[in-house]
UniProtKB/Swiss-Prot annotation:
The keyword Cytoplasm applies. Its main location: cytoplasm. L-ornithine binds at residues 99, 163, 167-168. The keyword Cytoplasm applies. Reversibly catalyzes the transfer of the carbamoyl group from carbamoyl phosphate (CP) to the N(epsilon) atom of ornithine (ORN) to produce L-citrulline. Carbamoyl phosphate binds at residues 15, 39, 66-69, 204-207, 232. GO terms for molecular function: amino acid binding; ornithine carbamoyltransferase activity. Belongs to the aspartate/ornithine carbamoyltransferase superfamily. OTCase family. Keywords: Amino-acid biosynthesis, Arginine biosynthesis, Cytoplasm, Transferase. The gene is argF. This is Ornithine carbamoyltransferase. Its EC number is 2.1.3.3. It comes from Neisseria pharyngis. Pathway: Amino-acid biosynthesis; L-arginine biosynthesis; L-arginine from L-ornithine and carbamoyl phosphate: step 1/3.
Length: 232
């Protein structure tokens, strides 16, 4: 809507990484466009594009990180908390191994925020990402807490974040395992109340499985008896 010329290259219309190397693709697209946004799977792909394109490359989403979502989330938290970000606390509860939890951890550390991760220890962010975030937080005054206790994670926060428990491409069999692991980390009215903050707000990058109004939501209800998964 800003008048830029945009070309969308979907996977079936591109040979990136298949018949043409990432390096060659980056060099060609960098001569044709003023910027490139990559939305895909591998973090290594977007980093290689950035290395060889010669123009700005934006990470629209990878398995590891979701920085463009963080720009929107930081703005949303700033608008709706009424406080500077450095005085804002938020929690992420659920499966914390992937892009949303990783990115929220890094975002909070960089902006000097109070960041809580509530998840089973087996589903925490990787040690090297946590170590990087803690190092940054030391410089910015950020606070980082990782806990297996969901109520401890949300105590006193301004925002509670979550994401889907099973990602695109994972088999249906993964649902039972995640439900067993994460049933105590669903965002419910009770968990919201456990924050002790009557103004606490809920955030989700979407799509969310919160009712039966989708094919997946209905299948989850019929299979597991849950009306809503990560949030009710």
């Amino acid at each position: 809507d800003q008048g830029a010329g945009v070309t969308y290259l979907e996977p079936s219309a591109s040979q990136i990484g298949h018949k043409e190397s990432i390096k060659d693709t980056a060099r060609v697209l960098g001569r044709m466009y003023d910027g490139i946004e990559y939305r895909g799977f591998g973090q290594d792909v977007v980093e290689e594009l950035a290395k060889y394109a010669g123009v700005p490359v934006f990470n629209g989403l990878t398995n590891e990180f979701h920085p463009t979502q963080m720009l929107a989330d930081a703005l949303t938290m700033r608008e709706h908390s009424g406080k500077p970000l450095s005085q804002t606390a938020f929690a992420y509860v659920g499966d914390a191994r992937y892009n949303m939890a990783n990115s929220l951890l890094v975002l909070g550390a960089k902006l000097g925020m109070d960041v809580r991760i509530g998840a089973p220890k087996t589903l925490w962010p990787s040690e090297h990402i946590v170590a990087r975030a803690r190092a940054v937080a030391k410089e910015t005054g950020g606070r980082i807490l990782l806990t297996e206790n969901a109520e401890e994670a949300v105590k006193g926060v301004d925002f509670i974040h979550t994401d889907v428990w099973v990602s695109m491409g994972e088999p249906k069999e993964a649902w039972q395992e995640r439900i067993d692991l994460l049933k105590d980390y669903r965002v419910t009215p009770e968990l919201m109340a456990a924050s002790g903050n009557p103004q606490v707000k809920f955030m989700h990058c979407l799509p969310a499985f919160h009712n039966r109004e989708t094919k997946v939501g209905e299948w989850i209800y019929e299979t597991f008896g849950l009306n809503g998964v990560e949030v009710t």
